[in-house]
Each structure stands twice: as structure tokens, then as C-alpha cells.
């Protein structure tokens, strides 16, 4: 067992940009600017370039000031590591522009499934699994939306993510995905979650760490639903949490260990390159090396792996979101450094096996 082409610049927080129709539209607020020249200043060769990897989490973005689509991801995936497949995560990209509001997210599933279909039998099967958005507050009525996703997904639709990231600190809010307080406890939302397992679908949970007890309650109430926690359980170390970092770690780690008691819960190990994580990698004159990343991440990632075990942990790139902090190659190198003492079977689970099982990638 284990012991204890690049995206364009992101716009400033809460910036408004003119839409094509002349309206003002809120743009992304939470993500760091991607600086290709900065990233290129500290590129490393890929460590263990033959190790098979299935990337458990990435997006396509097509927003004002933030473009990262299939060609961009392929460029990163082919930059040295042996990325054999990936799981695509909803990102409000290519929604339908007409029809019932609840069905508009099906456009993203249809687009991603279509544009990646030619890759499914090649060396990099991008979006071998697809996770889309559905408004789970529809309760039992969400089943029609889920069935539409399944039809659009060309056999690759695997689950739903409906963000639940809420905190009393307004500086943590993302204006593109406003979330009400207590969403995980909402009876209508829970009725929607209950529709997933009968269709063989999983639930991806993106929340902030103070909400982990609410997720425990949701997961315990839905033992047949596979719940996959994103980004190490929502580590937040900025805003009102900036001066409480030891307390944050203790509270987070206790909640994650409690959550790990439920066998239907899995965790994605990664996603610690965001502004909210407070590692401040982006402030360096050069990007962090993989050794620096591994050192900074070790307490958090090893806690996840120790609590859940390799059989319920999977590494993720979270690109392009994390690309504001480090390069694709350096990030995966860091994961390899962190697991250098693990057995071959444990590493295979973390880099390929767990995600393949959790999302039924075959």
C-alpha cells in the first residue's frame, strides 16, 4: 500500500465583455490566465513516457478570452506522456441555442461526442467517457434530460455534474455558475440524483471542502450511485480561509477520511492549480517544476490516496483550468514523482485502472 495550442489569456475576475448580440455577458472569474511563454520557460521531458494514462478530467472551453478545444487538448496530450484516453467534463460549451432550457446542455454532449468520434479507435481516445450537465433540481423529471444525453452521447455518456460550490465568502463565487446555499440538501436535487443509478450513470461532485459533510449525507442516502469527488474535495485556501491554512487542512482531511468510509465514493486526485487552492504557483518568475508541485501537493494528494486507496483514486489534469499554474507535462510528472514508491498495480490503478472502472470505459 502507498504510505502517508495553448489557451488564450483568461479575463480578470468578474469582467464583463460584449457579446455578439451587443449584450454584456459575465465571463470566467475563478481561473488563472494561461501564459504560453511563461509555461515554456520551465518545460521538462516526460518522466516514464510509456506509462499508460487515462486522464480522468478535462474540458473544452469556448468563452470570451478563454478558448481551449479539441486541438488544444490533443497538443497537450501528445506532449510527452502516454495519454491513451480521457474523460470529458461538462463546461457549458456548445449548448443548444434553442428549445427547452433543460435540454440545452445536451448540445454539449452531442458536440463533444461528435468531434471526438474519429479518435475513439486511435492512440488518444479523447472523451472516451463524457460527463454532462443536467439540472438535478428537476427531480424525477430530469430523467428525460438524462435519456437525451444518453442518446446524444454515442454510447459514451457516463454521468452528470451539477455544481454545488457555495460558500459564505462571496469572493469564491463563480458568476458563470451561481449556486444556492444548501443545494446538496435540497429534496428536489436529491430526487434528481436518485435518477442516475437506474440509468447506470454516476454523479460528479464539485464542491468546496466545508460542504463535504453534506456530500457524505447525500452519498449515504444513495448507496447505489457512484459518486466521484472532483479536485481532491474542494481545497480552498484564499479569502476567508487564507489565514486558517492549518485548520483548513485538518478539517478537510477529517471530512475526506469520513467520506472514504462509503464504498460508493471515489476521488479525483488533481485540480490543485486553481486560484482558490492558494498555492500561488502563478506568482513565480517561472512555472513550478514537477518536484516543486509534488512537494506542495503531497500532504493533500497522499491523504486522498491513503484514505480511499488506489482503487478509488484517479489522477486528473483538470486542463485547461490548471494550465494557469503549470504545464501538462510537469503536472503529470509530479503525479509520477508522488507515486514513485508505489507498486506497479497501485500505479496502474491511479493512472488508468480506477478511472476506467469508475466510468465504465472498457
Where are these regions (language model features)?
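Mid-to-C-terminal alpha-helical segments outside catalytic/metal-binding sites
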Residues: 3-11, 18-52, 68-74, 84-85, ...
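Catalytic pocket-lining loop regions of alpha/beta-barrel enzymes
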Residues: 22, 179-314, 343
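Active-site gating/metal-coordination segments in enzymes
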Residues: 22-38, 100-211, 217-221, 233-234, ...
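Histidine-centered catalytic micro-motifs
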Residues: 52-63, 229-232
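Conserved, mostly hydrophobic/aromatic
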Residues: 57, 86, 130, 196, ...
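Catalytic metal-binding/acid-base residues of hydrolase active sites
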Residues: 59, 92, 135-136, 163, ...
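Alpha-helical scaffold segments that flank or form the walls of functional sites
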Residues: 65-125
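Structural recognition of the beta-strand scaffold that forms the well-ordered cores
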Residues: 87-88, 131, 159-161, 228, ...
Amino acid at each position: 500500500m502507498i504510505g502517508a495550442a495553448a489557451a488564450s489569456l483568461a479575463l480578470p475576475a468578474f469582467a464583463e465583455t460584449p457579446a455578439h448580440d451587443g449584450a454584456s455577458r459575465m465571463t470566467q472569474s475563478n481561473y488563472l490566465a494561461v501564459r504560453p511563454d511563461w509555461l515554456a520557460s520551465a518545460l521538462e521531458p516526460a518522466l516514464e513516457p510509456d506509462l499508460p494514462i487515462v486522464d480522468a478530467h478535462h474540458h473544452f472551453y469556448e468563452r470570451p478570452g478563454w478558448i481551449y478545444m479539441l486541438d488544444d487538448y490533443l497538443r497537450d496530450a501528445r506532449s510527452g506522456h502516454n495519454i491513451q484516453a480521457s474523460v470529458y467534463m461538462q463546461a457549458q460549451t456548445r449548448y443548444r441555442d434553442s428549445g427547452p432550457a433543460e435540454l440545452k446542455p445536451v448540445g454539449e454532449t452531442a458536440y463533444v461526442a461528435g468531434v471526438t468520434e474519429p479518435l475513439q479507435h486511435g492512440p488518444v481516445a479523447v472523451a472516451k467517457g463524457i460527463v454532462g450537465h443536467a439540472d438535478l433540481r428537476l427531480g424525477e423529471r430530469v430523467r428525460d434530460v438524462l435519456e437525451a444525453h444518453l442518446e446524444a452521447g454515442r454510447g459514451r455518456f457516463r454521468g452528470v455534474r451539477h455544481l454545488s460550490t457555495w460558500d459564505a465568502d462571496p469572493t469564491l463565487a463563480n458568476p458563470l455558475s451561481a449556486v444556492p446555499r444548501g443545494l446538496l440538501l435540497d429534496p428536489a436535487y436529491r430526487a434528481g440524483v436518485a435518477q442516475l443509478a437506474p440509468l447506470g450513470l454516476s454523479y460528479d461532485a464539485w464542491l468546496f471542502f466545508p460542504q463535504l459533510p453534506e456530500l457524505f449525507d447525500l452519498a449515504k442516502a444513495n448507496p447505489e450511485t457512484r459518486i466521484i469527488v472532483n479536485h481532491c474535495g474542494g481545497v480552498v485556501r484564499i479569502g476567508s480561509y487564507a489565514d486558517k491554512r492549518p485548520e483548513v487542512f485538518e478539517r478537510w482531511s477529517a471530512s475526506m477520511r469520513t467520506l472514504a468510509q462509503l464504498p460508493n465514493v471515489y476521488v479525483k486526485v488533481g485540480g490543485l492549480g486553481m486560484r482558490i487552492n492558494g498555492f500561488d504557483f502563478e506568482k513565480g518568475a517561472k512555472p513550478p517544476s514537477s518536484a516543486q508541485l509534488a512537494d506542495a501537493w503531497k500532504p493533500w494528494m497522499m491523504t486522498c490516496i491513503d484514505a480511499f486507496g488506489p482503487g478509488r483514486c484517479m489522477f486528473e489534469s483538470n486542463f485547461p483550468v490548471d494550465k494557469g499554474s503549470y504545464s501538462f507535462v510537469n503536472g503529470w510528472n509530479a503525479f509520477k514523482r508522488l507515486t514513485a514508491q508505489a507498486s506497479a498495480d497501485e500505479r496502474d490503478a491511479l493512472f488508468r485502472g480506477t478511472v476506467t472502472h469508475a466510468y465504465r470505459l472498457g
